[in-house]
Amino acid sequence: MGIEAADFDKYDVVYVSNAEEHQYLDSYVPKKQIGTKALSSVLVSLADSGNGLKVSTYNINYCTAGMYKNALATAGVEDANVIVAGPFPLSGTAALVGTFEAYEKLTGKELDESVVDAAMDELVTTGDLEQSIDGDSNDVEAMIADLKGQIASGKIKTPEEMEQAIEKLADKYDLKLSDDDKQKLLGLMKKLQGLDLNWDSIKNQASAWAVSYTHLRAHETAAN
């Protein structure tokens, strides 16, 4: 990230322990994957209102920029620039915890624990899907953003409507979901629906995802 230890006094520095990683993630991630040390780092800066979330990663091999973006939006983080980095390839789970704590310190807004827990669940569910599905991570992340956007806009409300939406979006994004994958998604969406989230922000993020996804696919088509 280009920041030397001597420059730390220019920043608000938050340290995340490995114990905090386990506190947030043990319910969703095998302890072996979390490890015994918190090594990833994150730089968070606030952006002007309406700029949305921008995330970039370096040396992070489990969490993608899209995974962070979706989870952060769920937790209520908005209008921020986030850089996540590791000294060598690593999972990046500590950085997500650090991002939440840094955002709270920067804004003075305390994030609801149940919402943060749901964001962690979303991150891990997304990662599990990306590992189990023979597909592009962008497709999985766009589908989840799309699902959340439909809940935010009131297009889907009941579990039955969620199941139908999952089926339709799997086709839209050309993803082959197993029954277990579908149940994980359904469980996550039901959890999110039951929380007091910033649904306007989630709806805006879903729209931004749709635009970036369209540009990505158009670029790939042009390259081919």
Q: Residues of each region from the PLM?
A:
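Soluble oligomerization/assembly scaffold segments of membrane-associated complexes
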Residues: 73-175
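Catalytic-core signal marking the mid-to-C-terminal active-site face
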Residues: 155-213
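Conserved small/polar residues in nucleotide/adenosyl-binding loops
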Residues: 214-221
